[in-house]
Amino acid sequence: MTDSHYLDRAREKLIVALDFWEVEDARKLVRKLGDEVSFYKVGLGLQLVGGNEFAKELIVEGKRVFLDYKYYDIEETVQRAVAQAAELKITFLTVHGVASIMKAAVAGRGNSDMKILGVTVLTSMDAEDIKEMGFDGKVEDLVIARAKKALEVGVDGVVASALEAAELRKQTSNKLMIVSPGIRPSGGARHDQKRVATPFEAIRAGADYLVLGRPIYAADDPKAAAQAIIQEMADALRPD
């Protein structure tokens, strides 16, 4: 395979998080990145300032959109909200990794092509954090339990740290898509992330998609930062 083959595959797997509070700031980053990035995450920061309309704008421009609103409400509300998101032609949508919520999301998705992702444990959390939530044991055990439930109720994948990706592959018979945030280039600052991996480590561990925000949008040259990350991902995809 040629280098361009692995670079193209890596580009498909990179999701850039638009963690802004104003749509215009997100729009400026998208312009800077140009054709280098085709997949963007729109989260809660943009939700109340036109996030849905901006998502439509991105889709019209040929971009894929990961709507990361992490729905968590009564089943009927989740089902209806997911149905509305499906009408936007969203690619990925997150809901909390609770069985009843995920089941409602699958029902709301209907026959659309939108993929539902169950959030397992945030990468900003560690064992101490889940202990405060009332869960004893390892973070990995909770992630695996929620992933198995996700598979059981019919969602398409999970959001999980790359640190758990390899074990997730084993425990779910490779049947769930794994989307991994908490990705930091070698030597990069962790910021608010506690369970992190490099792009190379994440791809080798079995993550299907990587979500990166600050390492790209806070860089002096966001496009060059994205290109470096894509190269590292491509290196991981290339057989030894």
Curated annotation (Swiss-Prot):
InterPro entries per the record? Aldolase_TIM, OMPdecase, OMPdecase_bac, OMPdeCOase_dom, RibuloseP-bd_barrel
Metabolic or biological pathway, per its Swiss-Prot or TrEMBL entry: Pyrimidine metabolism; UMP biosynthesis via de novo pathway; UMP from orotate: step 2/2
Going by the UniProt record, its keywords in alphabetical order are: Decarboxylase, Lyase, Pyrimidine biosynthesis
Q: Which GO terms describe its molecular function?
A: orotidine-5'-phosphate decarboxylase activity
The UniProt entry's GO CC annotations, sorted and at most eight, read: cytosol
Taxonomy, superkingdom: Bacteria
Which E.C. number(s) belong to this protein?
4.1.1.23
- Catalytic activity reported: orotidine 5'-phosphate + H(+) = UMP + CO2
Q: Where does the record place the catalytic residues?
A: 70 (proton donor)
**A GO biological process held by the record:** 'de novo' pyrimidine nucleobase biosynthetic process
Q: Signal sequence: where? A: none
One Pfam family per UniProt: OMPdecase
Residues noted as binding substrate in the record, renumbered to the chain: 19, 41, 68-77, 123, 184, 193, 213-214
Q: Which HAMAP family match?
A: OMPdecase_type1_B
| Job description of the protein | Catalyzes the decarboxylation of orotidine 5'-monophosphate (OMP) to uridine 5'-monophosphate (UMP).
Stored NCBIfam families? PRK00230.1 (NF001273), pyrF (TIGR01740)
Q: How does it assemble?
A: Homodimer.
What name appears for this protein in its UniProt entry?
A: Orotidine 5'-phosphate decarboxylase
Organism name: Nitrobacter hamburgensis (strain DSM 10229 / NCIMB 13809 / X14)
